[in-house]
């Protein structure tokens, strides 16, 4: 589900990886959908948002609409994809938000992070890279190598001379290596802002000044605080690590149930029993 902001490299990586894992792959451009929605908005509010606007609300809205369209399309494809090829059944939508993105809210509410289940939702970006490295060593998939070496980017802003101008780490203000350390101090370390700052002064004493560490702690906790509302609609993730954003004590939102055939059989027996008594 590419757009005019998608780089050639990303599109090539997607195709190559699909070939490597023997998966069906199709390319769909969302630009016409984005334009149609924006025109409807313009009719009602007499405003056409632009990336060149000095109002950050416009640039954020333009990015968010792309992300949310991808969520809608993903569910449509999951529901009708097999029907289009004359096959029975339906598909599940998989989420793509990792631990670091979830903790700092670097995702759009109800975007492509919204899904039926998130297989990487409890794993950090650094550990995901390590996992991909392990797979690459075993399989030597060319598309995977390019993905591992690529700079993380949402690709929701216009390209500059055909190249990506937007990067995750620049927008977050923290590197994924830093987020991996901070995330573990939060959980399972159980540290709040002050305890985290004190600990990082020890861990990063040879890398940053205390003022720089203070700024990084402030950035993380500010993002964590203002974006925590997004966690209320986060897609259930597989519990793979102890630093997951989820509560591991129990699942407050159970959604995997047995078929209840035993209970239904007992109900049917009770119905027959009651009928006989009458």
What are these regions (language model features)?
Residues 1-278:
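ATP/NTP-dependent adenylation/nucleotidyl-transfer catalytic domains that generate, transfer
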């Amino acid at each position: 589900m590419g757009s005019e902001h998608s780089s050639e490299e990303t599109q090539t990586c997607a195709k190559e990886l699909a070939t490597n894992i023997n998966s069906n792959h199709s390319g769909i451009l969302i630009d016409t959908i984005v334009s149609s929605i924006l025109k409807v908005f313009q009719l009602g509010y007499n405003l056409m948002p632009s990336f060149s606007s000095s109002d950050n609300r416009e640039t954020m809205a333009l990015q968010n609409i792309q992300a949310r369209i991808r969520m809608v399309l993903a569910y449509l494809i999951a529901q009708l994809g097999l029907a289009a090829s004359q096959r029975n059944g339906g598909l599940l939508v998989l989420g793509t938000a990792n631990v670091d993105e979830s903790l700092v809210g670097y995702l759009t509410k109800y975007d492509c992070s919204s899904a039926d289940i998130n297989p990487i939702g409890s794993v950090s970006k650094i550990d995901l890279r390590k996992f991909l490295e392990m797979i690459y060593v075993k399989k030597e998939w060319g598309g995977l190598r390019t993905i591992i070496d690529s700079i993380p980017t949402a690709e929701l802003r216009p390209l500059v001379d055909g190249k990506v101008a937007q990067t995750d780490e620049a927008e977050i203000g923290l590197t994924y290596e830093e987020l991996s350390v901070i995330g573990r101090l939060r959980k399972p370390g159980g540290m709040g802002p002050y305890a985290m700052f004190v600990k990082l002064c020890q861990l990063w004493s040879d890398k940053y000044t205390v003022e720089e560490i203070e700024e990084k702690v402030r950035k993380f906790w500010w993002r964590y605080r203002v974006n925590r509302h997004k966690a209320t609609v986060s897609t259930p993730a597989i519990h793979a690590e102890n630093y997951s954003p989820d509560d591991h004590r129990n699942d407050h939102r159970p959604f995997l149930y047995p078929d209840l055939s035993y209970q239904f059989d007992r109900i049917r027996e009770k119905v027959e029993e009651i009928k006989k008594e009458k």
